[in-house]
Amino acid sequence: MERLEGKTVLVTGAARRIGRAIALGLHAEGARVLLHYGTSEEEAREVSELCGGAPLYRANLESAGEIREMFARIGREQGGLYGLVNNAARFTRAPVLEISEADWDFIHSVNLKAVFFCAQEAARLMGRGGGGRIVNISSMGAFLAWPEHVHYCASKAGVVALTRGLAKALAPRISVNSVAPGVIPFEEREDPAIQKMARSTPAGRPGTGEEIADAVVFFLKASPFVTGQVLQVDGGLGLR
């Protein structure tokens, strides 16, 4: 397996929750972590300090133009890129008959559109160094029917399809894989329905951000022969 020491990896949505755990996990592996954030500047600065002063990159991922500008800056300042972790995402609940066009666009603009344009720009930078690794964070919602999260589930199913398509399009120099987390609570007062879902898994508990980070590290270190794959880190949730 590859070593991550000294390799430059960008994590989107790195200020909080799973993104924070991924950034810290990559820093522990010796990677040169780049931290993207949207609005959570204070939290992003805290993660930066924990990652040895990791560079911060702010961008509104709803805008392909801002994504291009962010990667152009990375190219100027870092010279290249080894890895991209497309983690930034939005999650909302709404009955299916109440989902508006604005609700749909709010989710898909970040959960799917931004994943594509970040991967596109990252691939350009990775080409300078002979290749790289892209890891997209999907969700078990891509595979399970969650009736009050239809717009979210559709976006994450799109991430799975996008991962497979990109894996073919960018081979053999760039591998593209996905991690699909199960129940990973971060709020002190988590939704009772989510708590119940976590208890019903074969693992009998929710997962942790660190467990998702471990899966991301695996794909970033894996041989480029591993590509187009989706690793479900869900405590067996998908077996129900």
Q: What are the residue ranges of the model-derived segments?
A:
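Conserved glycine-rich cofactor-binding loop
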Residues: 8, 15-17
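Substrate-binding pocket helix/loop in short-chain dehydrogenase/reductase
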Residues: 95-96, 103-108, 134, 189, ...
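Active-site helix of classical SDR
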Residues: 119, 155, 163
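Alpha-helical segment proximal to the catalytic Tyr-Lys
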Residues: 124, 168-172
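Residue(s) in the substrate-gating loop at a strand-loop-helix junction
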Residues: 139
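Short, small/polar-rich loop/turn modules that mediate ligand/substrate recognition or access, typified
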Residues: 171-175, 227-228
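C-terminal substrate-recognition "lid" of short-chain dehydrogenase/reductases
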Residues: 208-233, 238
